[in-house]
Curated annotation (Swiss-Prot):
Name of this protein: Glutamate racemase
Regions that span the bilayer: none
Record's function text: Provides the (R)-glutamate required for cell wall biosynthesis.
Binding site for substrate: D7, S8, Y39, G40, N71, T72, T207, H208
Enzyme class: isomerase
Disulfide bonds: none
Gene name linked to the record: murI
PANTHER family: GLUTAMATE RACEMASE (PTHR21198:SF2)
Residues forming the catalytic site: C70, C206
Catalytic activity: L-glutamate = D-glutamate
GO molecular function: glutamate racemase activity
Keywords, ordered alphabetically: Cell shape, Cell wall biogenesis/degradation, Isomerase, Peptidoglycan synthesis
Pathway membership, UniProt: Cell wall biogenesis; peptidoglycan biosynthesis
Amino acid sequence: MAIGVFDSGVGGLTVHHRLVERFPDADFVYLADQANAPYGGRPGEEIVELTKAGCIRLFEAGCDLVVLACNTAASVALRRLQQTWLPGYRRETGRALNVLGIVVPTIEAATGLPWEHEAERRGEKVEKLDILGVFSTPATARSRVYEIEIDKRRQDVAVFSEPCPELARMIEAGAPREELKAVIEGHVQALRTRIGRAPDRAILGCTHYEIVADLFREALPPGTPLIRQPEATADALARYLDRHPEFDPGRSGLRRFLTTGEPGAQNSLVETFWGGPLSFEPA
């Protein structure tokens, strides 16, 4: 089998790149739903249906395991698909299939605790000693997944989300770096104003943002730790494959890149990040 990696666009390539480095012999199929990107401003029901369609396309391409390398899809659609759609689809196809996301590994990295751990609540107020900023799409911010799930595990962490409605679209379109820099600086300043100071740590809660992580570092105070989703996801996938040997990621080093958009319409930001051009096939 192959491992499928799904995103609304090219941002998930940041996760895919790290997975390929971590599992160089494994087979991978990447799907970018660029015809519908970005997902961040869409209603929840649309996000669920688009994510389901992407998973089906990757299953049809020979993947048994799909990683949602899209915070919006993972935060809005993953749990619902796992609970209400995937069990029936497994029975229908007779295949052992699963869908994972990048939010769980990110929360594990942010809290230093396994997903299964939830803090005991004793009723007393816990002082918030650690301020964590989350830069994300509007849909991810509306879901409050980071606030809710981190608070379950670390009540001493205060989470502040800063929705960045235009940023993923700009990165997807290959906007000039100076324009991206100005937008990022504006969102960092907006978050600082709301908190009253800079965050102690930050999550780039959209995989597109990893492409311009250096601009976030420049906008944040020097030395502000960034929780890196590609690394956290690769670590989590390694643990998952160890626990589930039935998901064999293959050994031929297959690399396929699919898009629902125009195959030749990839931008220079992606090529710079990847280290060269990528050849996409129509999905």
